């Protein structure tokens, strides 16, 4: 027989280390003898660091006794290279004790005479296979910081199931997930997720794991957490939610993942800002465009100071973002809690280049549409951008030509406006003049160098519009100006209904009708009051 006692559950004793708590583990000894009691004595080689209760005793046949091994952690101890395993050794002596009687374990500490275990008197079995393995929060935090994958798995598997070892926290209140995320280790995160951690646990700084990953831009980790149903919304403990942190830090891929999982694009931070506010403030243009494309409100006010994203862009002097926000329908005349519009904020910071987009461009547009030449001249002298465009790409020249304001057209041309500027559908001022039937305006444009052959995005020339609408005078002006007539006979049908005009070419293609919002119609009720934006 090799031994009198078996070690349960194994020869490895796990000792849980926790700050301010007794550090101990248990070992069960089983007497494998059927008829004889067995005496035992367990001794640590390092008696300063360990104590055992009971250290010796009698075990009846086929019964067990549980020992407590207490670890006395010295201050400022340097962890061994073998950590979480320990090189400390123990000696277990056991000997058959005929006629001995087992007593209450609480009274068996050193109750067995030491001479029972001398080989001169009896056959003594000596076992040195007992090993120590440390578990606990400090152990796991240390291993995660070091990135020791195998050791982390082993400690998690060996830990007592009565405490949730995977939810261990360090002295800063960070969970193991937070530590793994801070190191940018998706492999560690995936390992921890196998053991079912609380993925909504907040650190002492009040951030959830998903918020932490969103802030650092760890897209793969974010994907892993979202796969485990991590909440995309800000909790009451957090200052900012995942979408705010991703947008404010410019993490576009993370932002895409959050939006795909249904994150509320207009949710507010604790101080009342949306993700769009933060993206604009940090000049994260790609993130701002993505948010706008996913339904972010361009004119939402902060519950703090009442600023809209446009106020912020104006204060920064960000021309590009001002243009993007205006194109997405931002209302430029909203006032914040201090009674200021975006224009007022731009003026306060000396961003003169934004004046046209935020105010002067509107006035120039209105003056051009109404034919107010003096007002046009004054606005241009005060800094209005002559080539400024509205959200559809129209310049003041487009508007003046559409309305037939020839004196304004002359003034704009004399001041150097681009006569061939195109809107978002490829229409030039000449297209607008022809479609509206203004012969004198079209003739002036041709004389001033307008390109007669330019086509819209649908491939339509000004001459095709004139012929399709049977404008003989305009057709003559364009032909005399050098317009090229299309080869072949062009049959057309004119459809006029609800303020829409569509020209259909039955031989060489179709000139599709344009939408009410963007079409150039001849109805006096057509709204051309949309603001200009500066490019």
From Swiss-Prot:
Induction: Regulated by RAM1 during arbuscular mycorrhiza (AM) formation after inoculation with Rhizophagus irregularis. Repressed by inorganic phosphate (Pi), leading to defects in cortical AM colonization of roots in high Pi conditions. SUPFAM superfamilies: Ankyrin repeat, PapD-like. One of its GO terms (biological process) is protein K6-linked ubiquitination. Keywords: ANK repeat, Cell membrane, Cytoplasm, Membrane, Nucleus, Repeat. One of its GO terms (cellular component) is cytosol. The gene is VPY. It comes from Petunia hybrida (Petunia). Mostly expressed in roots and, to a lower extent, in shoot tips, stems, leaves and flowers. Disruption phenotype: Impaired arbuscular mycorrhiza (AM) fungi (e.g. Glomus intraradices, G.mosseae and Gigaspora margarita) passage across root epidermis and abolished arbuscule formation in root cortex during AM symbiosis, thus leading to aborted hyphopodia and no arbuscules. Residues 4-135 form the MSP domain. Its main location: cytoplasm. This is Protein VAPYRIN. Pfam families: Ank, Ank_2, Ank_5, Motile_Sperm. Required for arbuscular mycorrhizal (AM) symbiosis with AM fungi (e.g. Glomus intraradices, G.mosseae and Gigaspora margarita) both during fungal passage across root epidermis and for arbuscule formation in cortical cells; this symbiosis promotes phosphorus (P) and copper (Cu) uptake. Essential for infection by symbiotic nitrogen-fixing rhizobial bacteria leading to the formation of root nodules. It comes from the Eukaryota. InterPro entries: Ankyrin_rpt (IPR002110), Ankyrin_rpt-contain_sf (IPR036770), Ig-like_fold (IPR013783), MSP_dom (IPR000535), PapD-like_sf (IPR008962). GO terms for molecular function: ubiquitin-protein transferase activity. Interacts with EX70I at the periarbuscular membrane (PAM) around the arbuscule hyphal tips.
């Amino acid at each position: 027989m090799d031994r009198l006692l078996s070690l349960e559950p194994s020869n490895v004793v796990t000792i849980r280390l926790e700050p301010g708590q007794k550090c101990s583990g248990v070992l069960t000894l089983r007497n494998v003898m059927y008829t004889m009691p067995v005496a035992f004595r367990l001794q640590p080689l390092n008696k300063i660091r360990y104590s055992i209760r009971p250290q010796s005793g009698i075990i009846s046949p086929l019964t067990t006794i549980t020992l407590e091994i207490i670890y006395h952690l010295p201050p400022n101890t340097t962890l061994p290279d073998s950590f979480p395993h320990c090189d400390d050794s123990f000696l277990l002596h056991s000997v058959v004790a005929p006629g001995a009687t087992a007593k209450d374990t609480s009274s068996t500490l050193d109750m067995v005479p030491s001479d029972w275990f001398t080989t001169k008197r009896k056959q003594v079995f000596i076992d040195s296979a007992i090993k120590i393995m440390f578990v606990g929060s400090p152990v796991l935090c240390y291993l995660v910081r070091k990135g020791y994958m195998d050791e982390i798995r082993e400690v998690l598997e060996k830990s007592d199931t009565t405490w949730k070892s995977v939810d261990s926290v360090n002295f800063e209140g960070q969970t193991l997930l937070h530590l793994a995320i801070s190191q940018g280790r998706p492999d560690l995160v995936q390992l921890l997720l196998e053991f079912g951690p609380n993925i909504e646990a907040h650190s002492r700084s009040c951030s959830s794991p998903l918020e932490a990953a969103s802030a650092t831009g760890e897209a793969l980790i974010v994907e892993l957490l979202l796969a485990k149903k991590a909440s995309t919304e800000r909790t009451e403990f957090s200052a900012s939610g995942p979408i705010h942190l991703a947008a404010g830090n410019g993490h576009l891929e993370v932002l895409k993942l959050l939006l795909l999982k249904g994150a509320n694009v207009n949710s507010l931070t604790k101080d009342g800002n949306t993700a769009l506010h933060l993206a604009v403030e940090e000049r994260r243009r790609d993130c701002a465009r993505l948010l706008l494309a996913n339904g972010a409100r361009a004119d939402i006010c902060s519950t703090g100071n009442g600023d809209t994203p446009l106020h912020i862009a104006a204060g920064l002097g960000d021309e590009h973002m001002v243009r993007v926000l205006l194109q997405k329908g931002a209302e430029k005349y909203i006032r914040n809690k201090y009674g200021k519009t975006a224009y007022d904020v731009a003026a306060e910071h000396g961003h003169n280049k934004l004046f046209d987009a935020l105010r002067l461009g509107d006035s120039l547009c209105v003056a051009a549409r109404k034919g107010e030449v003096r007002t046009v001249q004054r606005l241009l002298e005060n800094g209005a951008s002559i080539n400024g465009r509205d959200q559809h790409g129209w310049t003041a020249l487009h508007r003046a030509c559409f309305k037939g304001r020839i004196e304004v057209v002359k003034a704009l041309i004399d001041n150097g406006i681009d006569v061939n500027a195109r809107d978002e559908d490829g229409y030039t001022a000449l297209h607008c003049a022809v479609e509206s039937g203004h012969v004198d305006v079209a003739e002036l444009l041709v004389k001033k160098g307008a390109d007669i052959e330019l086509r819209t995005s649908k491939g339509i020339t000004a001459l095709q519009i004139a012929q399709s609408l049977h404008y003989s005078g305009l057709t003559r002006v364009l032909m005399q100006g050098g317009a090229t007539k299309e080869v072949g006979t062009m049959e057309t049908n004119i459809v006029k209904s609800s303020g829409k005009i569509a020209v259909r070419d039955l031989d060489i293609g179709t000139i599709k009708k344009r939408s009410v919002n963007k079409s150039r119609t001849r109805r006096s009720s057509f709204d051309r009051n949309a603001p200009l934006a500066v490019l």
